[in-house]
């Protein structure tokens, strides 16, 4: 069923898809190579609940931002990954991080602090394009690993 939007405003439409408290956190964590339910649940510092995480994963998949592949050794485990549509949200995450760093007078976590340090002398476009290309390489490795094994497990 197609998503119903509140208006024809582009900003409102995007917020209807990912404007809740958790969706961009899940996208961020996928960029950080947290790709199983357990990793998404336990490795972030925000303490998302299992039902909220399940709901956001479902909504992000239905909206085409993410997909998953079953683990090659344990088909109960899903490895979530960003689609190209989801990867393009990297620009949004980057801009939100830069805004926070500029205007919020506070100490940030180690990941954010490290990110600001290593990117401070780099152009916005370079940081975004490199982040996207590195993620795509890792995603492709993940998919190749799990999909190739599934091909070999076919019985004749």
Residue ranges and their predicted role:
Residues 1-10:
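A detector for short, charged/polar N-terminal pre-domain segments
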Residues 5, 21-27, 37, 122-131, ...:
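Short histidine
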Residues 9-52:
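N-terminal helix-turn-helix DNA-binding core of bacterial DNA-binding proteins
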Residues 19, 72-96:
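Basic, amphipathic "hinge/linker" alpha-helix immediately C-terminal to the N-terminal HTH DNA-binding motif
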Residues 25, 29, 65-67, 95:
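Solvent-exposed, amphipathic alpha-helical segments
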Residues 38, 58, 78:
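Residues within the helices of the helix-turn-helix
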Residues 45-71, 75:
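Canonical helix-turn-helix DNA-binding module
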Residues 91-156:
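C-terminal regulatory/oligomerization modules of transcriptional regulators
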């Amino acid at each position: 069923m197609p998503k119903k939007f509140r208006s024809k405003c582009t900003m409102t439409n995007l917020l209807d898809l990912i404007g809740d408290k958790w969706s961009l956190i899940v996208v961020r964590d996928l960029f950080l190579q947290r790709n199983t339910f357990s990793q998404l649940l336990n490795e972030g510092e925000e303490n998302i609940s299992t039902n909220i995480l399940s709901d956001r994963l479902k909504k992000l998949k239905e909206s085409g931002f993410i997909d998953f592949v079953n683990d090659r050794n344990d088909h109960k485990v899903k490895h979530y990954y960003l689609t190209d549509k989801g990867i393009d949200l990297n620009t949004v995450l980057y801009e939100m991080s830069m805004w926070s760093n500029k205007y919020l007078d506070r100490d940030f976590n180690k990941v954010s602090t490290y990110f600001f340090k290593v990117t401070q002398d780099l152009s916005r476009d370079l940081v975004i394009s490199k982040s996207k290309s590195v993620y795509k390489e890792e995603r492709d490795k993940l998919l190749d690993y799990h999909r190739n094994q599934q091909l070999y497990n076919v019985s004749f």
